[in-house]
A protein has these predicted regions:
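Hydrophobic faces of well-ordered beta-strands that scaffold small-molecule active sites
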Residues: 82-86, 119-121, 167-169
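Beta-strand-rich binding/interaction modules
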Residues: 1-2
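Short amphipathic alpha-helices and their capping/turn segments at secondary-structure boundaries
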Residues: 71-74, 105-115
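Aromatic-lined carbohydrate-binding/catalytic grooves of carbohydrate-active enzymes
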Residues: 110-155
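Conserved beta-strand->loop/alpha-helix structural units within folded catalytic cores of enzymes
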Residues: 154-170
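The substrate-binding groove and active-site-proximal loops of carbohydrate-active enzymes
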Residues: 87-102, 136-150, 166
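The feature marks proteins involved in alpha-glucan
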Residues: 5-85, 90-95
Length: 170
């Protein structure tokens, strides 16, 4: 199927028999360049994952039945900022990539106990090459899936705010 370009620069498609994309469904765009088909992740994807078998990257349809339950409406950052800079994947003792949930459970309480008022999370956007330290970004609107789901990151932010800690995303 070919995308149709609209007057406003947006491309769209209607596929007969397909009424909606399903939650969890993976997708990508196939671009033809110099006669070759190239798989591309849409620039505005908000959740991107890597296939464990063939290591390809795809966008994922990711919408929740109910909105995320933010609990930080009353949060206001402190006037004095004392920043704890961290990398979620490296902030643990085990020899594996850490997760948002592990950070929330194991590191965040120590950050609060030490009196930090802000958490600067490094390399948060999706990037395919882990050794790049997260600075070869491929998807600016997607948090790195190797650390967990978007809801896991939101839960970490809620927990930080509950402890009086502001969150900065690098």
């Amino acid at each position: 199927y070919k995308l149709e370009k609209k007057d406003n620069g947006v491309f769209e498609i209607f596929i007969p028999g397909i009424h909606t994309l399903q939650n969890g469904q993976r997708y990508c765009a196939i671009v033809v360049h110099d006669g070759k088909e190239l798989d591309r992740i849409p620039a505005y994807a908000t959740y991107v994952v890597q296939d464990e078998k063939d290591h390809s990257w795809n966008a994922v349809v990711h919408h929740m039945e109910d909105p995320f339950p933010w609990t930080d409406e009353a949060f206001r950052p402190k006037k004095t900022v004392f920043v704890y800079e961290c990398h979620i994947g490296m902030a643990q003792q085990e020899g594996k990539v850490g997760t948002y949930r592990e950070f929330q459970e194991n590191v965040l309480p120590r950050v609060a106990a030490l009196g930090y008022s802000a958490l600067q999370i490094m390399a948060i956007q999706e990037h395919p090459y882990y050794a790049s330290f997260g600075y070869q970004v491929t998807n600016f609107f997607a948090a790195s899936s190797r650390f967990g789901t978007p809801e896991d990151l939101k839960a970490l932010i809620n927990a930080a705010h509950a402890l009086g800690i502001a969150v900065l995303l690098d």
